[in-house]
């Protein structure tokens, strides 16, 4: 009798709990109706409704519940918000709407790449939370930032034991404060002078917190295999996941070797390493014009650089090294390098070095091209766009299942300079050119590379998939109309084709226009 009463009571309580749950689910903040859901896993798309409540996905299915707002998604794709794992969006403090990212569907940005980041991660996060931001933000801790803080201008050497201990302590604190891992920029100063052993020592601190090592490698051209081996060694000896930033083969001398690069990565994975990579979908890169100048000439202060140029012998050595590098890359001149943002003389923005030399020096000889480069650096430097990537290599990297899509961009100031178009169009370009036009990828696979793959790799929990209970970062786009509109010659155009972009359940983009909302949160390592 007692057992029967207990069973009846349990049944009644179960029914009551189910009724309460059903009642709570009878209303939602937003109902997305009739869309073709691409859930981020790579599974085939299917048609269903999506209900959003309190910043999370409440339910998926054929839903008939009251909603405060409704979006008709018939004929449109509904997918998780895109995650960009390689940005330089530290300027989000000044540009919190991050419009170029949101308007191409990116809802979560990973900052701190290429070795450069905020030093005090906790303080940086605190500022962003106080200001309010449109996208979600996570960060890595940058090796160059840490090395500069500890070693100052004396960086052409290994750190002392005491300095290395200080660097490690800073990395450990950043990880405690929520950084996702450690990034390096090994073509930049001061990281270019760091030995592999130094990076391993710092990476072990990251491994202890289940972080990731993310590297702009020492070389992406003739010595790319040696650079990859260094990444693999760091991952192996430190015992952590590794990620190769903006994978590419730079310069004609290296073109056609993408299959070999992929084979090297696959061998490392077969040997037990967890290695992934990202790419931007353009045949040009972008960094400082200073990268055309030898490291040894850039290693000191601006005054020291100017002193080298004033010394005839030292200047002749710099010029000779620049000519040698040009020949090694099988290039005849510097026409591949375009000035993107030069504050000293904006009339040169959009012109390549050959054109700039002809315009300003009256000659486009190699010597005058080099003088033009040195003059730009003498006047404070400029960012540049460098054409040197083969489309066939790009597509081979794209077809690898562990290649993510990342912009390598900061937040754009609209109509300022002639920047690389990737900052406005990278994700939309994947879906327009490589999915719709070239059919190189299925839409389900392309979306997986932008969502669940980066979420799992970088440990961004509750994001990257459309499923009940996950954060409601959602993009709704027209697969027939989605388009990158930014070009190298005319870059300041936002992507098109987005019906809506939601961040934590709040509509941030509506019909290709930013709403001004700032619902973004800090995504800390968990």
Residue ranges, per PLM feature:
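Divalent metal-binding pocket/active-site signature
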Residues: 173-231
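Bacterial N-terminal signal peptides
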Residues: 8-21
